[in-house]
Amino acid sequence: YSGCGAEWSPGNSNIWPHQSSLDEEYVTNDIGVNGDNIIVSTYAVNPELAGGGECWTDVIRPMGVYAHEFGHILGLPDLYDKNSANGDSEGLGEWCLMASGSWLGFAGDVPAHMSSWCKLQLGWVEPVVIDQNISSANIGTFATTGSVLKVWEDDYYWNRYFLIENRQKTGFDSNLNGEGLMIYHIDENQNYGLNEMSGGFV
C-alpha cells in the first residue's frame, strides 16, 4: 500500500504489515492465466515507504518486512516473543528472518537468513542426521552452504531434536551481532503459540 507502515511507530494510524486469510474466498470478475476467475484468499500487505510518524517520502521500504511477511505466506510463524506472561524473551532474535532478523542492516535492507528450522519446514534444507557417536563433524557456513546438523534428543526420536548451524557474518547474515554455532532445541509436540496480533494460533 502507499505510504508508511505502523511497524515503525505503533501509535500512529498507519496500517500494520501483516499476512492473513479471508474467512471466505473472494472471487473476482478478473480472469487468470488458467481462464478461471481469480480467487483471493490468503494475502499480505506491506508499506511502500519507510518512516514512522513522519513518512520518509524519498526512502522506499527496505525488504526485511516484505521478506518476513512472505515467510508467513509460505506458512511460517512469527518466531519472536508475542506474550511476555512467562517472562520477556526475544524469541530467535536477530538470528532469524521470522524474528527480529528482518530488521538487520538499515531498518531491514539486509535481513538475516531464515533459521534452519524455517528452511527445514519449507523443504529448503536437508539436514545431516547424526544418529551415532562421533568425535567431530564439519559444518559449512549456513548462509552459503545451507549446511545443518540434526541430532535426536535421547528417548525422543522423531519429535525432539537439536538443529546445529554455523552462522557467519556473510551475505544476508553480514549484520549479525556475532557469529558461531547456533544450536536450536526443537520440540515438535509444542504448538507455535498464540499470535496476539492476529488473535489466533499461527
Role assignments for model-derived ranges:
Residues I186-V202:
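Extended, compositionally biased non-globular segments
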